[in-house]
Amino acid sequence: ANTDGYTIGMITFELATYKKLGTSELTWENYAPLCRVNTDAAAITVGAKWAADNGITDLPGFIDYCKAHPGEVQMGGSSNASVWHIAGGYLMSATGIDIQMITYQEGAATAVQNAAGGFIQGVTVSLAEARSFIESGDLICLGVMDEERNPVFPDVPTCKEQGYDITYYTQRGMAAPLGVDDAIMTRLEEACAAAIEDPDFVTFMNNNGQAISYLDAQGYADYLKQAAVDVAAAMDAVGL
């Protein structure tokens, strides 16, 4: 792409999977990070009836149940090798449990519907995607894989609060092509920082249950470097 600063793009979670899947040789190192804009954490959400029938009220109870019933619990994500499919692998690698990750080529919405209907035990998708069924009482969220609680669901604890150091989320950020002049990069970074604080943008994100999680250029680069390692381990756990 042209390096005059007028062409920038968005980096998403999927970039971390391309090389391991053989889709592309591209990695985050092929771009110049500008800022991280948003993260959307995976959450461990299960069918309310199934949880009640098995006395599960929190994340430790769910983990204990999975350890007592290895390979029996079916959790849905989305399509194969997608962010929420890999979230299940991260959950397994972080806790030592063995669950079946069911993929849905139609996407997370179908997985959520199947969990609400009792066809699978739960899902490892975002709170935003499971929101309507959580609010209806068909699903309950046992924990969110984030550093802090989701402001839309303040009563849902993080995994860390319950003794499990698990953070995992999809992410979206801005990047420029390699080779953009330093002075132009600085202007772009400043513009990103200002845009993040725009009241209309903040309102839009809050109304849609999307977490603003800004990182500057260096912070975003550090994050992407570590995420590449973490995602590779999670992919191994689901056989990718």
Region locations from a protein language model:
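Solvent-exposed coil/turn segments that connect beta secondary-structure elements
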Residues: F13-L15, T39, K49, A128, ...
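Extracellular/periplasmic bilobal clamshell ligand-binding domains
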Residues: D216-L240
